[in-house]
Amino acid sequence: YHSGFSVASGETLLVFDYWMGRQGKKLPAAQRITPETLSHFSEVFVFISHGHEDHFDPVVYTWEQYAPVTYILPETMDASLHGRRMGVGGEITLSRHVKVKAFDSTDEGLSYLVEMDGIRIFHAGDLNNWHWREESTPREIEEAERDFQQVMETMRGEKVDVAFFPVDPRLGMMFDAGPNYFAMVVKPRLMIPMHFWERAEVIREYARRSRSPQTEIIAMTTPGDMILLEFDEQENMTVHMQSVTSAPVARNKKVQDR
């Protein structure tokens, strides 16, 4: 939901930027992470990119009552929050299944590249080209682009299987400049747009027109939408989409390793 995603492999669960929504637009109860959900996993890793309301819900700190939870958060966040703290460029081995590397953001906090059972997952947090082109001065636009491109250079050459990246229509004209540049530089095998503020129709159109032979793009627009990834012996990846609003669909889209 919004920028919140969970990724499971075996008995390991990753949770990124969990948020239950604003009052009046709360995440449906059936789509929330519950004690029952957590009970299925022997290790849970909760990644918090920064402290903005829409990326950090304090409810995550109640989960450790129900499962072995490790929290990963920026070293700049409130000192009262416990967990493994990271700075830009830091790397931590969290378990024999999971390790993480922290990258910078163009807003607060961090973005994370997590490897779980050989699958490399990037969550951008609020990393984007926040140019606000229709409101900003030419100098502000240039600075926003430069700051974003500098972070992208630190990611050049990183292998990414799945990327969660902001595609925010509020930016107005050229709202897709950031994700397009990210896809060009990093070439993730699968990109999932996020942070689109209920503008599902924009994201569906973006996914339709922006996918490429290098990067498949799938719009997960409804809380509870799921994707199943399968890998063969040659590391080709097959993507199966299941939406809560329709019957399961096997896209059988094979994305070959780079």
Spans of features found by a protein language model:
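Active-site-proximal loop/helix segments of hydrolase catalytic cores
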Residues: 106-184
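Active-site environment of divalent metal-dependent phosphoester hydrolases
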Residues: 3, 22-23, 51-56, 78-81, ...
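Pre-active-site segment of Zn-dependent metallo-hydrolases
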Residues: 4-47, 58-62, 127-157
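Extracytoplasmic
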Residues: 1-2, 41-42, 66, 95, ...
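Beta-strand-turn-beta hairpins that frame and shape the catalytic cleft
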Residues: 8-14, 91-100, 113-121, 229-231, ...
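Active-site neighborhood of phospho(di)ester-bond hydrolases with catalytic His/Asp-centered motifs
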Residues: 15-17, 42-54, 71-75, 122-125, ...
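Active-site HxH/HxHxD metal-binding segment of metal-dependent hydrolases
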Residues: 33-92
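Binuclear metal-ion centers of metallo-dependent hydrolases, dominated by the metallo-beta-lactamase
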Residues: 82-94, 106-108, 176-258
